[in-house]
Amino acid sequence: MLSQTISEARSFLADVLDFVFPRHCTVCGERLQKDEQFLCADCLLHLPRTGLASAEGNEIEQLFWGRVDIQRAMSFFKYHSASNYHRILMDLKFHGKPEIGIFMGRLMARELVATRIFDGVDVIVPVPLAKSRLKKRGYNQSEMIARGISEITGLQIDTRSVVRTKANVSQIGKGRQQRQENVEGIFSVADSDALKGKHVLVVDDVLTTGATTISLISEIQKVCDAKCSVLTMAVASN
């Protein structure tokens, strides 16, 4: 009886808060229903998913061929700066909303777990941020996505074994070669024993040329015998 009363009180309070402080869809701006989070049902339905999880040798994996050795790679949805779905990344990276990263991580994991992309993975390594950017933002957006994935899959997150040793300038506006040069030597493996013999899932927010991820994986594979796969929330689309 008491538990039912508490549950009803919580539901009533949630209704009041939603009335006073209505929540809106990140993508379209429409008011969210009680059971919706961040994205309304329509925007969630039309999220431009890549559908690449079950396709070995897909276009995401091909970005890494001949550059680093990977097991699997895929991105969850396609993003373009002119699309309203760009707002997901903007809120996560620049508008101080880490919770949307956790939400997207959960969404990705729920939809992808049946594709077996997580099979054999031992640990998740979110791409580290430079200390200066972490201090400014207050959180690592890739770690937020990783947290959501971890909640659904049970995979552990390792934020200590790989560190970012310097802050590179923004990749925005740079070509492929410039991007690769910009990220050379920015990572270091602090604990190779923790990753030795493991299958590491590298998680990041958005994939463009793959330069940052390649730099990180190269550093891991220089110092320890580890398999690596890649999962990003989004991939830049022309």
Task: Label every PLM stretch briefly.
Residues 1-203, 208-238:
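Glycine-rich phosphate/pyrophosphate-handling loop used in enzymes and phosphotransfer proteins
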